[in-house]
Amino acid sequence: MGFLTLVLHKLSICPFSFLLFILYASAVPLATTNTRPSYHITPEKKWMNDPQRPFFLGDEWHLYYLYNSNFDSSNPGSGGTEWYHITSTDMVHWTRRGVVLEKYKPNPPSGIILGDIETGSAVVDINNTAGFGRSAVVAIVTQMADGVQQQSLFYSTDNGYSFIPYEGNPIMPNPSPSAKPAFRDPKIFWDDKEGRWVMSLAEGDKIGFYTSIDLKTWAYVSEFKPENAGVDLGILECPDLYQIDLDGDSTKRTWILALGANGYRYNRTTGTAYWTGKWDGNGFTATESFPQWMDDGPDFYATVSWENPDDRYGSRYAIAWMNSWDYAASLPYYADFAGQDSLVREVKLKTINSSPTLVSIPIGGYGEIFASPKSVSDKTITTDPASASLPSGMEQGAYIIRATISKNDGDKGNEVRFVIKSDGTFSTTVGYDFVHSQAFLVRDSDGSATDSMAAGPKQAYDTVRTAPDPTGGSTVKLVIYVDWNSVEIFVNDGEAVLSGLIYPNQEANGIQVVSDIGSLTLVSFSYAACDSIDYLGKA
């Protein structure tokens, strides 16, 4: 979703929300640290938001993200977005290639400016169905001008390094331009069984499905409208329809419909909801009425997933924008850039408690960027930080913690707490509650930079976030990825996940492991630092 769409997004929820957005977005404070994340995708400068689904072509991965080169911290909702291109051979180290779809450019031959470039999707047209050449890259994106959203097509014959606007744009005009309804975020894929392209399109409180044989002309076939969508989930965005094998069994191939939503009823900010179900070539039928959530943290939105070339249906990859529209316009951004993506994750569908559930862990390539670990084991931890006897030399800003904690017979503790990014006054706490079988993230006192946020966004930011552990038990395994201003917590091999931004004070890198009361057993603990890998160099 582009920045101009954000204004309409707020307005479509309620007029009062729009007024609050104007008030909250009047100025964005700068953070108290100027350290760029070490191993997350960030823009070289200015603003980034939604990632666009990557594809593999020419021996490299291609990822685009929404980019605002005119980002102004005093007026963060202005400027519009375009597509910025980065490439990688391992999805860990990335190279910046520059803007490939520019905003506010006249479309030939009419010369009409159709708007900025917002979220969409790109495919490799291996069968030349569109007529632009075999393996041309075809991108279908939302453009918005004067509040009217419509879909345009751009194509590339140089592996996605540059794009040409299609002369027939817009290929999908808004059906009711005077009313200016939501009509955005096209996600397209090739339906092998039907031999045609399928598009899912966000249309307010529902998802519309369309089909095409040439990527240019699209026919409406059906819609999916979640129960109480407008009340429970708000405006729906960034749909993603795909197949994946349940428990790695090809006879249990399952369809997933994921989308960006507001978790009002579920005490959530914006996040990624999903349903399992069936696609019959024309429509999606969900197995359950209510969604599951891909990540229980506050900052995992506009998620895209894509095929694993080595295991097409056994697993997928996924990445998301680490932010929330509940406070995106009020965060204390850095002086030279704003925004980051999550880690790239491998996603599988597993049966947990009789329910098909998406689980995710960071891809293996991240294991190569950390130093040799420092570790301890078999410690009894209490409310005294000294009880854990943690290794010395843990002062880096970016690192990974791996820990296994047990509540054994005789242990009186209920929670293990990892107090990170501490300067003695401010800190972030992540941990696990054995009584309620859930992980948690507490960041209401992460640093002084967020204290100046307006009341509404501040409340959304400060709310404690929890992730239910579906299997529970007396032992839990946590893997915690900490970067300079983010934390991603993976519980029991990704059966539960929490992702969130944090804004620590300068050089606040203290770490403690304690219990809430009594004692718990720290079965194992390791810490490994990550130096900046300069993963986003210029080409």
What kind of region is each of these model predictions?
Residues 1-4, 539:
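A positional/structural detector of protein chain ends, strongest at the extreme C-terminus
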Residues 2, 16-31:
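N-terminal signal peptide
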Residues 3-14:
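Bacterial N-terminal signal peptides that target proteins for export
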Residues 28-185, 190-232, 245-296, 320-378, ...:
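Beta-rich carbohydrate-recognition and catalytic domains
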Residues 185, 238, 477:
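Beta-strand-rich binding-surface signature
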Residues 248-250, 278-290, 294-301, 306-539:
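Beta-rich accessory regions
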